[in-house]
Amino acid sequence: NDVLFNLLDSHDTERLMNRFHDLDKFYQQLAILFTLPGSPCIYYGTEIAMEGDHDPDCRRCMPWSEIESKEHQEKIAMMRKLIMLRRNEKVCRSLHFHFPNGYENDRCVEYIKLDEEGNKIEVLLNASDEEIKVKGDGEVLFAREFDGEILGVNGTLIRRM
């Protein structure tokens, strides 16, 4: 539904990073959030992978001194990439998607997003503990742990088809 309000953490839950303690898994979850239907919502601190257990620990103060010292620049840049991808690629906001099951590995999640003009993107998440040889090609829009052919363990690939 296009009016869903999607979030992965909030003032009522443990923070996303607390569930994984792994940036690659963290960004896999955010890639899903920014490519599925609905409105993605980011809780303050998620852009820097802030940790925090259940309430009240999830309501820690924003670490402004760390941000001002540019300690989190790479994380902020990754979040900006995902936000800009969602903003600039209409297909990311489309309601239409399917799971082609094109990979034998059960821990490889692949879905194809389509829009009304026929544009397509593929979202590929390697949740296994083995590298995956990526099939086909396309313009890479967002990637982590991807070398152009192999999607590494806990890797993420979003590409135009």
Regions flagged by a language model, labelled:
Residues F26-Y27, P37-I42, T46-M161:
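Carbohydrate-interacting/catalytic domains
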